[in-house]
Structures are given as C-alpha cells and as structure tokens.
Amino acid sequence: MNLKEFSKRIGINPSTISRALNDYPDISQKTKDTILKLAKKHSYKPNLSAQSIGSIKSKTSFKVLIADKISDASFKIFKDNNILIDKKYNLTEDQILSIISNYDGIVVRSSTKVTKKIIEKSNRLKVIARAGVGVDNVDVVTATNRGIIVMNSPQSTSRTTAEHAISLVFSLARKIPFAHHSTIQKKWEKELFKGIELKSKTIGLVGCGNIGSEVARIAKSLEMNVMVYDPFLSAEKIESLDAEKSSLDEVLKHSDFVSLHLPLTINTKNIINLKQIKKMKKTSYLVNAARGGLINENDLHIALKNKLITGAALDVFESEPLKNSLLHSLDNIILTPHLGASTTEAQ
C-alpha cells in the first residue's frame, strides 16, 4: 500500500501523515499516535527518510536550488552551514527538470510547483523545503515514497496570516473597502455603509491548526464567540482556546463569520459549495485566507448574487492570479491578491 492509498483509506491528507510519521513538532502527539496505530492496523509501511537535519547541515557539498524569492536573511543560514545555493527564479517545469539533478534540495514558496515529474527526475534530491505553511504545491506522496523530506515553516507566517484573516473580518463588518471606493468618488454615504460590531458575534473556524488557533485567540480578545470544526483538534486544545468544538453543519448554521483554515486536499477541495452555503445565515460572511479550491467559486458567485449570505472576502483563489472571474462582477465581495503571508516580519 502506498501513501496515497493509505491516505484515502483513513481519510487523513498525505502531508499530515508524512509529517506525523517523520515526527514533525507541529503535529500533535495525539495525531501522531492515531496515525501510527492506523498504519499498523492497515499494514502500511512508510518509506521514511533516513536523512536528518543534522546530517544535512554537516555535508559541505550539499547544494540547494532557491526557486522562489525568500528573505535575504535566510541566505545566512545556508552560508553558516556550508550549504551551496543557486538562486534561479520564475523557472518553468521543463527548466527545473533540466537542472534538478544537480541539487540535493529545493526551496520554494507558493509559485513554483514541485511535481511528480520533477521529483522522479533526480536521484540526488533529499529535501524539498516550502518557505511557508501549505505544501499543496508539492507532490508530497511521491516525495515521501522516494524517501525525500518535505519541510515547511508552519509557525513563520501563522500570526501574519491570522491578522490578515481578521482584517478581512473587520473589513466586511465595517464595509471599509466599499466605503473607501464610494468616498474617493466624492460621495458621502454614511447610512449605506452602516456596519456591525464584532463583540459578541460568533466566528466559526473550519480548521484550527497554527493559523486557525491564532485567529481564535485574536477573536477571543475581541470578545467574540469561537466555534471550531476540526476532527483532529484535541479537547485540551479546544479548552485552551476557550472555543466550542462543533460539526461543520453546526459551525455553518450558527456563525456570523465563517473563516477557513484548512490545507487543500482531495478531502477538502470544494468543502464549501452551494449546498453548504445554504446552511449559513443570510446575515453571515465567508472568509478564505487559507487555500484556493476550498470554496467552489462558481457556487459562491451564485450565493452572493442571490444574497444567500451577506458577503465574502477571499485572499486565495483556485487559479492565481485571478483573471476573468465571475467574482469580479460582485459588489458584496472583498478580493485581495494572496497577501496572507506578505509582511516584512513573516518574510
């Protein structure tokens, strides 16, 4: 049984399985234990990498391709560990295929896709590092099956992305972008842009990992009620967040704001569609600063056009950059160009 088959059988995304079995610190011990038990039950024997971060750093001949722009401060880390780097940005898949055999590692952000073809092309590749949280632009299944470590930086952008999600909540509640657009046209439409307070409102989090937890903490500081749908969240974590763990249906039904904080997997793609949106209150708002593809954008267009919910704010899209989308025609949506991790501190 390979990783993909095991993932489908137990209903847990491959990235979480891989990180749990490689004992990554961002995966809770409870989740690790659960996955280990399921692996034993289903006779799944992962091809775990024998590489360790220590052994990687000790190799003076270790060479890494930096395929997307990262902070200049990051280069000192490579230098201090005698790791050679090549900075080559905006490469096509074919261009990467032609050079990937020269590298032990590759560093990407969200633009570059590390595909199955790229991974299988090189027998030298040992590490794929994603400078950010999500790894949906990396074929984790193929990498894991070949014993290649897939790394990310789950804590690095958590606060930044959480703040952006909350900023979108504020913007919807107080209609700030719409009021700005009106005012620069020399209009003065105070009554049109009357908003709502966030205090005592309920925010429902669909997914509550590092970023979702930060959103929960900020929301509680605003005296909001927090509901959470996350099958993998422990009772201890829920208690520490002072949140209420609920089903997806209950979160959609009772929340004033629904905010998504999930990875994009075969199980989460289009998790929010027209059927789910119809369960939400007509006065509610939908926010996605996680991954494009979690929301069916055509269904969202229908819902907003027909006022099934009051509004939405999206920072991520199924296809980026966003071009020729039906969402552009709506006057009750806020769109930002994937700014979640775009702060000086996070970079």
Language-model features and meaning:
Residues 92-96, 113-117, 247-250, 272-275, ...:
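Short acidic active-site motifs
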Residues 103, 122, 254-255, 283:
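An anion/phosphate-binding loop that grips the pyrophosphate of nucleotide cofactors and donors
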Residues 22, 50, 111, 133, ...:
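Short glycine-/small-residue-rich Rossmann-like dinucleotide-binding loops
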